[in-house]
């Protein structure tokens, strides 16, 4: 019925414009909107409300609830998103994504993506959000609507433990060959340093390159380094040395999506009731949490 009303409104618009032009007599008083105009909502993200208005039909929240799933784009990135022994996706981000989906009345579905294609995956509606320890760079914030930052992080240099003493400054890194995840903050850092590097699909693959000796070093997230290298891990002979920067993590949604504001509302409540801290302590990221304003 709404579609018929819209069609009728479009057909009548020229006639109404002529009629109003003839009868206005210079009266500039605002004309009330038609009764069947659909409601709109202002959406916002980490940078505050935007000027974009979404109709009910364009609402991502309504879209998610209608299909019953929140499709989350991820990569294998411990301790944020990774599989347990049974193949289920777990991790701090994965657990919180499930809780967010539950707050919307839907199920979370996880899809591994090529990190370079994350914006294309979002815009093509193959996924509904990117929730994978994503650094809030200017590039990310210009291409997506993002929730408020929730975690602090840094990029660090990973080298064999036996060589760590030789690589304690940025200057000492110049002659090293690096492995970095393509499209990542680590790639940005190695380009800034002017070092040679090999792009790989994931940060986990970058560690494999160093372990195999095909690359001298890797640049990965500090949170991942803390979880995946050193004594008691699969990479006991690797360590990290130089901390290259500091950054913040956030969740990305389609540009103009009302899911960003829904996330902010959810996160504030989940932080207040202890859900966030419980998950953070489970995966050892509690010291990196950013308290909501």
Question: What is each residue range found by the language model?
Answer:
Residues 18-22:
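C-terminal motif of bacterial Sec signal peptides marking the signal peptidase cleavage site
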Residues 24-27:
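Bacterial signal peptide processing site
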Residues 48, 95, 110-121, 165, ...:
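Short helix-initiation/N-cap motifs at beta->coil->alpha
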Residues 58-133:
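Extracytoplasmic small-molecule ligand-binding "clamshell" domains
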Residues 94-103, 161, 177, 182-184, ...:
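Extended ligand-binding regions for polar small-molecule ligands
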Residues 102-103, 111-112, 116-129, 143-145, ...:
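Short helices/loops that flank or line small-molecule/ion binding pockets
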Residues 147, 159-178:
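Flexible hinge/capping segments at coil-to-helix
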Residues 152-159, 222, 226-268, 286-293:
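Periplasmic-binding protein-like
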């Amino acid at each position: 019925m709404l579609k018929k009303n819209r069609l009728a409104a479009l057909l009548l618009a020229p006639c109404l414009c002529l009629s109003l032009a003839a009868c206005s007599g210079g009266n500039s008083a605002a004309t009330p909107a038609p009764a069947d105009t659909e409601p709109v909502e202002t959406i916002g993200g980490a940078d505050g409300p935007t000027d974009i208005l979404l109709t009910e039909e364009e609402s991502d929240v309504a879209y998610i609830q209608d299909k019953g799933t929140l499709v989350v784009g991820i990569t294998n990135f411990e301790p944020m998103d990774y599989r347990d022994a049974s193949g289920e996706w777990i991790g701090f981000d994965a657990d919180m994504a499930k809780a967010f989906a539950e707050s919307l009345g839907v199920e979370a579905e996880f899809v591994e993506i090529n990190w370079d294609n994350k914006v294309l995956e979002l815009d093509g509606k193959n996924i509904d959000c990117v929730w994978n320890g994503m650094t809030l760079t200017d590039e990310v914030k210009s291409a997506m609507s993002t929730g408020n930052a929730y975690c602090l992080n840094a990029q660090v240099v990973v080298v064999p433990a036996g060589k760590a003493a030789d690589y304690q400054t940025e200057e000492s890194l110049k002659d090293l060959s690096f492995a970095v995840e393509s499209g990542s903050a680590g790639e940005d850092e190695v380009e800034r340093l002017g070092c040679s590097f090999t792009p790989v699909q994931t940060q986990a693959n970058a560690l494999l390159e160093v372990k195999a000796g095909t690359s001298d070093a890797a640049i990965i997230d500090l949170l991942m380094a803390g979880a995946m290298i050193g004594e008691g891990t699969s990479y006991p002979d690797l360590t990290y040395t130089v901390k290259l920067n500091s950054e913040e993590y956030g969740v990305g949604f389609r540009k103009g999506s009302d899911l960003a504001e829904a996330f902010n509302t959810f996160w504030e409540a989940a932080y207040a009731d202890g859900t966030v801290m419980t998950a953070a302590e489970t995966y050892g990221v509690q010291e990196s949490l950013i308290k909501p304003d």
